[in-house]
Amino acid sequence: MSAVIKLKTLQGHLQDLNGFTKPKVQFEQYETPAHIAAVALYTIQTQYGSLQDKLVLDAGCGPGILSIGAVMMGAASVTAIDIDRDALEVLQENIDDLDINNIDTLLCDFLDEKTCRWENYFDTVLMNPPFGTKNNTGIDMRFLQMGLRCTCNSVYSLHKSTTRSHIEKKIKEWGVKGNVIAELRYDLPATYKFHRKQSQDIAVDLWRVYHSDS
């Protein structure tokens, strides 16, 4: 399975995108770095062919780095969902700047049961879900579980490497399959006032979680 464009070219395009103007702590909004997004998308396409000519859902899309990257990797269409109107406005700016016509944006809560109208609809679901703070424990697993309901094939999701054993346990409970397909380093810059360090280096896993019959 080949890539539509080279990894370095993809990363260069993604670095030029607009990001969050005012990240909102209640939504745990952090930028997905261009190098993380590029390596993830390149791996997803070259190893599994899960982007080119596929129907893709970007859950919790933010300013849309995964959505736009998926289109650059040849996705047939992308549905980009986020709960934050401001984030979707930034995504729309990015779409307009690049003259993209196959990304549909939708303002809604991905975890709302109404999302299930897309049961088994998408070929591929992409997500960089909230890690889950003390006040929002388990949201990453709820995202992953909803993603599985929306795809007929695979979910590709970024998670802290420290949660690997927990995810392995959940996958077994849910009766699906999954494995880590890339180990990445996430240089998380200080985004909110309560962050004491200028940046924090976090080990991140790119997971492929999929239905047993896919």
What feature does the model see in each segment?
Residues 2-214:
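Class I S-adenosyl-L-methionine-dependent methyltransferase catalytic core
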